[in-house]
């Protein structure tokens, strides 16, 4: 499992190793307080940057274009890639130095909330052991920040030795950029607001003006549409097919559904976007299912609990999480991605429980599986 995970991590590091043209690099706070030390300005306590990265002083050269700093271009490439996959333009990333951090430390914020931090070494490379790595390389042993795998920071002159011994070697800017990519995808729902949605609508109106005018705001107010898109993004559903979303909202609007129920009703219409995340068109979808007895029991529990959602006995919850996690890891060890497929009656509630323990598992209703895709059931989970 570890070896296959290393291959997956390496591929992702390589996929994120993109070049761009610009990033939103704003000023340094190094000189703060040199004059008027007793004064506090509003800018000292307010920062409206949606995404920001603070760097320790040892990492500043990585964003200095005059020194050939590679990080700015990497981050721009990541923004482009994530924007394309999510379906909206991810905000600019503000990069600033922060003297309160250790020299090689970085910190990633969404708004004012710290969502990630770690340490990278600008004069070293991160070596991740691959499938055939047997020889231990000397260096600084760490866990890589994105995948949590064992890794080693090595000197540049050790790169050839590491690669010859089955390690995947990653540049420090790619380590940070890949970590950022994971965070942007994970927190995508926090990155889209009403202004962003209006931009999407204005763009769609150029090709489908009647559709936009008939749905927003006549049938669905802008703030409701924004909440619906956030709900979809929160479960890794791209919002790139806004035309499809609006067309189906036009039909659903007469049912007076809640935001959550509306998003749930939209999901089957976006099944292609969901499934393409886990399996190419020419490969079967690796599916984990629940036994009929277990699924019927969960459906009954959801109906009995009503608005409280699905409340599981602690022992049962632990047993199900363990079984699903082990089945997922078995598929991952083969270099593939598994999805859990359940009844639509319990999908949302069960996904909410699992998300707290198995973050990267996609939970689909069987109504969300495209008819033209091959299915391979890899495990069936029971309550016994």
Regions found by a protein language model. Give the residues of each.
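Membrane-embedded alpha-helical signal segments
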Residues: 11-384
């Amino acid at each position: 499992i570890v070896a296959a995970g290393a291959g997956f991590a390496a591929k992702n590091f390589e996929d994120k190793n993109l070049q761009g043209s610009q990033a939103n690099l704003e000023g340094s706070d190094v000189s703060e307080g040199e004059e008027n030390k007793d004064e506090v300005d509003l800018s000292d306590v307010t920062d409206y940057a949606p995404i920001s990265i603070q760097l320790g002083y040892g990492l500043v050269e990585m964003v200095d274009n005059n020194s050939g700093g590679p990080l700015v271009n990497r981050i721009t490439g990541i923004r482009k890639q994530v924007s394309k996959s999510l379906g909206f333009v991810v905000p600019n990333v503000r990069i600033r130095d922060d003297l309160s951090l250790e020299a090689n430390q970085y910190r990633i914020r969404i708004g004012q909330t710290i969502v990630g931090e770690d340490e990278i070494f600008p004069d070293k490379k991160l070596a991740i052991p691959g499938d055939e790595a047997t020889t231990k390389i000397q260096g600084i042993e760490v866990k890589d920040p994105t995948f949590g795998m064992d890794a080693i920071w090595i000197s540049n002159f050790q790169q050839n030795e590491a690669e010859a011994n089955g390690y995947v070697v990653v540049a420090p800017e790619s380590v940070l950029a890949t970590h950022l990519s994971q965070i942007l995808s994970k927190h995508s729902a926090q990155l889209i607001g009403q202004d962003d949605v209006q931009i999407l609508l204005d763009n769609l109106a150029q090709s489908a003006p009647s559709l936009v005018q008939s749905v927003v705001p006549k049938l669905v107010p802008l703030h409701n549409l924004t909440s619906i898109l956030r709900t979809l993004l929160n479960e890794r559903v791209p919002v790139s097919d806004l035309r499809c979303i609006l067309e189906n909202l036009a039909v659903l609007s007469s049912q007076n559904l809640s935001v959550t129920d509306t998003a749930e009703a939209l999901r089957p219409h976006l099944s292609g976007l969901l499934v393409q995340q886990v399996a190419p068109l020419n490969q079967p979808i690796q599916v984990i299912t629940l036994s009929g007895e277990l699924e019927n029991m969960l459906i009954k529990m959801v109906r009995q609990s009503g608005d409280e959602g699905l409340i599981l006995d602690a022992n049962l919850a632990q047993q199900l999480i363990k079984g699903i996690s082990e089945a997922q890891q078995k598929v991952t060890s083969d270099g593939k991605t598994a999805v859990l497929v359940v009844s639509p009656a319990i999908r949302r509630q069960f996904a909410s429980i699992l998300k707290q323990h198995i973050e990267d598992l996609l939970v689909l209703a069987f109504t969300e599986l495209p008819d033209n895709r091959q299915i391979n059931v890899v495990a069936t989970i029971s309550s016994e």
